[in-house]
Amino acid sequence: MGHCFSLPSSQSEIHEDNEHGDGNVVCYGEEFGLDQDLPVHRLGSVCSIQGTKVLNQDHAVLYQGYGTRDTELCGVFDGHGKNGHMVSKMVRNRLPSVLLALKEELNQESNVCEEEASKWEKACFTAFRLIDRELNLQVFNCSFSGSTGVVAITQGDDLVIANLGDSRAVLGTMTEDGEIKAVQLTSDLTPDVPSEAERIRMCKGRVFAMKTEPSSQRVWLPNQNIPGLAMSRAFGDFRLKDHGVIAVPEISQHRITSKDQFLVLATDGVWDMLSNDEVVSLIWSSGKKQASAAKMVAEAAEAAWKKRLKYTKVDDITVICLFLQNKEQPS
């Protein structure tokens, strides 16, 4: 089962329910009919395919006209644990409104000379913390349930990325030779990263790999062999928050140039099967079909899972593709 959407849409308000997507994916957009000289939206698509588990624990949002006409928000969230689907859904539903409210506060309070990207960065740090705090107040148990989160905001030529966990943002950009290449904009924040493992151990958490998966380090409680979390930063997972797992995002900024063609956000259901270069090349070789780009990547990842694991396991797969140059032309 999969859900795939493309923008533009006709909705302009932020909602915290599911009216814009059947469960796992929501898309928002605006149709302004503005003057030809005003900025126009970038085009994007999003697709989520359920794996072999009972529930698809991935959620995603693609928001066009996010606060201002020239701003887009993308986010993918990969839940884990018993209630991971509820964690990722709650984060997906709440984060856009919380983040935008914080940004608008900064617009009113901050120095007029402060760059927009810097204000988005500050808003992301605070929003992630507040959302994690809200999760701790939910009726569903988040002790050993949580979610990754990678969020991208584009405003004009500014790109801000905030990341928790092992979902990933990758840029497709042109080389001097006219070839497309992949540039990874996020780090996979897992216990395999020495600095992440060190923080966890300093907080009395344990980091080691299971015998059945010797190449994958996991996080464990000090005196119990649970839960074996495969990431070092996440929303939720509150039993591990005293032991080094944090909800502090790693944030980066990028200035979009004419060489930058598209941005891909995806959960590890994609990256566990396809390399950055494979994903970028697939989109580019397809003729940059904006409306179907995310679906194309998701289906390629699904096929790779089925081929490699003989249909015994397929992870949930969620992809957003935002094209940075080819924009919607006003009517």
UniProtKB/Swiss-Prot annotation:
Family listed: Belongs to the PP2C family.
Disulfide cross-links: none
Organism, scientific name: Arabidopsis thaliana (Mouse-ear cress)
Alphabetized SMART domains for the sequence: PP2Cc (SM00332)
Record carries keyword DNA damage: no
Protein name: Probable protein phosphatase 2C 72
Keyword Hydrolase recorded: yes
Binding site for Mn(2+) 1: 78-79
EC numbers for this chain: 3.1.3.16
PANTHER family to which the protein is assigned, alphabetical: PROTEIN PHOSPHATASE (PTHR47992)
